């Protein structure tokens, strides 16, 4: 991995029954099924950092733009904590962070220092940053720094995954 924090990262798209992520014009973000969809907080935590000043990237036939200022684009970084513990302050949170990146311009609904609960809307899926098409980049890391943290395995709950028509399953 070029960036250690991305070791266990996922890129989420929405595909139709034929395996396509887009209908119509492939160079238009609005044509992608996931574009503009609500992004939810993956777990309880505190908003540690946000970036909101990136426009959506142009879609270059599956290539990224090398001149992008921040590969994450618009993003929310959450530091996870037990929100049921009313005694703790944001500074008492643990060392597990979630990064949600490539968010739609103007869609971030949370502020730095805000407490969030799992399932709470935080933004909308976009195509900002180093992105070949609209999608949600999601990773968990052991520190605040994108470049100097290690990626952590992600535990999903209530997910049923099975082979879809036209796809093969591999172990």
Residue ranges and their predicted role:
Residues 31-34, 102-110:
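Short alpha-helix capping/helix-loop boundary micro-motifs
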Residues 62-64, 76, 117-130:
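Short hydrophobic beta/alpha edge segments that flank linear recognition/processing sites
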Residues 1-68:
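Short, glycine/small-residue-enriched coil/turn segments at secondary-structure junctions
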Residues 46-104:
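Zn2+-dependent peptidoglycan hydrolase active-site motif and core
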Residues 109-111, 127-134:
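Short glycine/proline-centered loop/turn elements that form peptide/ligand docking sites
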Residues 66-68, 90, 114, 139-171:
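Acidic, glycine-rich catalytic/binding loops that coordinate metals and/or anionic ligands
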Residues 38-50, 109-124:
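Short, well-structured beta-strand-loop connectors
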Residues 14, 49, 102-107, 127, ...:
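A residue-level detector for short acidic-glycine micro-motifs
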